[in-house]
């Protein structure tokens, strides 16, 4: 009972600061990343089809509204040089620029810049204002344009409004409604720390930025040291990690810095907290500055006060002219940040707000890298001497930057999608033949099962092909059958010797079928169909008759459509579904399993049933016996769960590393099973054990088979964007 006037609540779970399960038990497996973007957090409802809405959008009218906004300077946040274009370019760049090739995470694909931590990264200072300036347009067009698309489109229109012919624009980015907690941003506990390095300067994978809270590099130079040559090393490493080569890197840096300015009118001590830490009255904005007016000529952002060209709102070649024709010396901004000034230049650069004032050209340490790194310098001079080459290179690199995480071109929407196939889009030839039908599928499955290929070989090959898919950047998957090509055919996880034999058998079956039928079957389809045949046979071996769903329509990629260097990033460091784990990785096996499951867009129950099924199907890499808790491998049964949960078995690690375990009979000490951490986590982790108990129950066999087939079918079709709305 409470007295009148006193609050009955002292604390509530809705307030941050309470100790979480993860803080109580830091080594606890994080399964939250397998249940992100729940319909419970999505206000649009289950029936909302963004692709349909976007295709009904009057894109021309929207772009015209954006063009008008560019020069409609607002009193609450005035536009530098009377034009918001440079601000919107930076917003779009920083939205897309978090992408990294190692795991495909980051990028502009779901509008994550609106949420923590990205909305409060030091490198994203003042971009809260850019998004808020867009709100009237987002409000006007509502559901027809996502924030994710609008952010990138605003950058495109900004470039066009300042004289650049862009390469194109593809819509189709669907907004998320919560932070993406699957992304590992680094171990640091403070902004701008760099504990991510080891050795001389080896950047931890999969990270693609030099410090916590930066998009790429420190613009002052490594750790604030104004050394252009050393900065070039960081630039090359980080831009490579987001999929850019040297020519694209030079084009992007020079093209982006053709416009606008950096903001460092005063010391950072005048700047208030970032959006996530700001008071409720700030309404989602942050970095309120008490330095003079706090805006316009008094704005403080990065702390750098740099204007690169004479025409900061027009596309031209000033950037390279200034870079090469002037001599540069280091200086400090009013905020105390290292930058460079053209010591032999006249005052020819305009002031952003006072037309009577002029400045000397200024640049960043990372700009000077394009002159003093010998490889970058050669490229930069070519762009300087050939402005048309530069304009085309920047337009193409910008398109790649802003579309890199969208997957194949078939996912792009709208009238401005370029018709040209680009190698980084992982193109696949269109299907140009009649597809097989049910009778053909049954005939082909019979041929496959009569060929001598085992259940394990069929399941293993289909999984190896399909499980390369990454929901992060929509790369990989079974479509294209790139498992036939380098580099995938040589990955140790794919058992190259066995793979070559399986593919040879399937290719002969394909050849014979295609020779006698007007309908054709691709190798991509046949590999998946073989896996389905294997699962059906395994179910029969376990006493169940089932039909595994199969939809034809895949095509076979060509070698010239496959970027070997780029596809190398899809090679698995670990695949817990096949009990594969490369040596030398410090991340626990079970954590890498969850990471893989998240990239496959699986839920915790789907992950669980797939691991249990793959074990009894004997699908471990190298045919290891770890986790094969059954005396009838090749039969689709729930034996994995029954035996894992058997309390007559006692588990102990084989050594102090606790990566391999032996399960012995508690009474006799007889060795029954061996297991990895991935296997035992399903009995150890309380959440996974709860799911395992469902599948280990006496009445669970039918449910197990049904759920395994459902999850299997999901993985086989993850890259079939032609089957489901965007």
Swiss-Prot record:
Formation of the three residue Trp-Tyr-Met cross-link is important for the catalase, but not the peroxidase activity of the enzyme. Its EC number is 1.11.1.21. Its cofactor is heme b. Signal peptide: none annotated. It comes from Methylacidiphilum infernorum (isolate V4). The gene is katG. This is Catalase-peroxidase. Heme b binds at residue 257. It catalyses: H2O2 + AH2 = A + 2 H2O; 2 H2O2 = O2 + 2 H2O. HAMAP family: Catal_peroxid. The lineage of its organism: Bacteria, Pseudomonadati, Verrucomicrobiota, Methylacidiphilae, Methylacidiphilales. PROSITE patterns: PEROXIDASE_1, PEROXIDASE_2, PEROXIDASE_4. Residues 471-490 are annotated as: Disordered.
């Amino acid at each position: 009972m409470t007295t009148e006037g006193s609050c009955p609540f002292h604390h509530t779970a809705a307030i941050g600061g309470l100790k979480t399960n993860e803080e109580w038990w830091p080594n606890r497996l994080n399964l939250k990343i397998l249940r992100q973007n729940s319909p419970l957090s999505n206000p649009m409802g289950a029936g909302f089809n963004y692709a349909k809405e976007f295709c009904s959008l009057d894109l021309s009218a929207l772009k015209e509204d954006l063009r008008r906004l560019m020069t409609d300077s607002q009193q609450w946040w005035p536009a530098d040089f009377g034009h918001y274009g440079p601000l919107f370019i930076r917003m779009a760049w920083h939205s897309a620029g978090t992408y990294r090739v190692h795991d495909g995470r980051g990028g502009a694909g779901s509008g994550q810049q609106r949420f923590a931590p990205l909305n409060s990264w030091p490198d994203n200072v003042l971009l809260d204002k850019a998004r808020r300036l867009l709100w009237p347009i987002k409000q006007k067009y509502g559901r027809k344009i996502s924030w994710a698309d609008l952010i990138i489109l605003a950058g495109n229109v900004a470039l066009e409004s300042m004289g650049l012919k862009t390469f194109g624009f593809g819509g189709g980015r669907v907004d998320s409604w919560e932070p993406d907690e699957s992304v590992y941003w680094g171990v640091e506990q403070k902004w701008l720390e760099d504990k991510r390095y080891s050795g001389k300067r080896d950047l931890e994978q999969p990270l693609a930025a030099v410090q916590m809270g930066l998009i790429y590099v420190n613009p002052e130079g490594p750790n604030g040291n104004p050394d252009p040559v050393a900065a070039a090393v960081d630039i090359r490493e980080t831009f490579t990690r987001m999929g850019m080569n040297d020519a694209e890197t030079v084009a992007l840096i020079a093209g982006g810095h053709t416009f606008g300015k950096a903001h460092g009118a005063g010391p950072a001590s005048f700047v208030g907290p970032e959006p996530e830490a700001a008071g409720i009255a700030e309404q989602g904005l942050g970095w309120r500055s008490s330095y003079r007016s706090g805006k316009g000529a008094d704005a403080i952002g990065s702390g750098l006060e740099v204007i690169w060209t004479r025409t900061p709102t027009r596309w031209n070649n000033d950037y390279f002219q200034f870079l090469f024709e002037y001599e540069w010396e280091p200086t400090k901004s009013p905020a105390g940040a290292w930058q460079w000034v053209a010591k032999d230049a006249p005052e020819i650069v305009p002031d952003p707000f006072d037309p009577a004032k002029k400045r000397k050209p200024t640049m960043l340490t990372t700009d000077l890298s394009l002159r003093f790194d010998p490889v970058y310098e050669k490229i930069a001079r070519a762009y300087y001497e050939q402005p048309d080459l530069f304009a085309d290179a920047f337009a193409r690199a910008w398109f790649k930057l802003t579309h890199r995480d969208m997957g194949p071109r078939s996912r792009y929407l709208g009238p401005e999608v370029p018709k040209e196939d680009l190698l980084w889009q992982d193109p696949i030839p269109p299907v140009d033949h009649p597809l097989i039908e049910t009778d053909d599928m049954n005939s082909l499955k019979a041929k496959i099962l009569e060929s001598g290929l085992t259940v394990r070989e069929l399941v293993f090959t289909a999984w190896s092909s399909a499980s390369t898919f990454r929901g992060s950047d929509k790369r990989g998957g079974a479509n294209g059958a790139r498992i036939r090509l380098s580099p995938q055919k040589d990955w140790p996880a794919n058992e190259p010797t066995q793979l070559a034999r399986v593919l040879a058998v399937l290719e002969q079956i394909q050849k014979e079928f295609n020779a006698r039928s007007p309908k054709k079957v691709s190798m991509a389809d046949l590999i998946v169909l073989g896996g389905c045949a294997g699962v059906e046979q395994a179910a029969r071996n376990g006493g169940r008759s089932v039909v595994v769903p199969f939809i034809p329509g895949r095509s076979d990629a060509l070698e010239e459509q496959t970027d070997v260097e780029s596809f190398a990033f899809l090679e698995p460091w670990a695949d817990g579904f096949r009990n594969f784990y490369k040596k030398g990785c410090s991340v626990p096996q079970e954590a890498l399993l969850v990471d893989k499951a998240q990239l496959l867009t699986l839920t915790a129950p789907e992950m669980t049933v797939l691991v249990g099924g793959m074990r009894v199907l004997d699908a471990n890499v190298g045919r290891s016996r770890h986790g094969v808790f059954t005396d009838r491998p090749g039969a689709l049964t729930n034996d994995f769960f029954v035996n894992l949960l058997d309390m007559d078995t006692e588990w102990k690690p084989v050594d102090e590393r606790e990566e391999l375990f032996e399960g012995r009979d508690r009474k006799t000490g007889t060795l029954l099973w061996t297991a990895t951490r991935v296997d035992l986590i399903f009995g150890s982790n309380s959440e996974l054990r709860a799911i395992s108990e469902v599948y280990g129950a006496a009445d669970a066999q039918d449910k197990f088979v049904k759920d395994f087939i459902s999850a299997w079918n999901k993985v086989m079709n993850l890259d079939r964007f032609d089957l489901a709305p965007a």
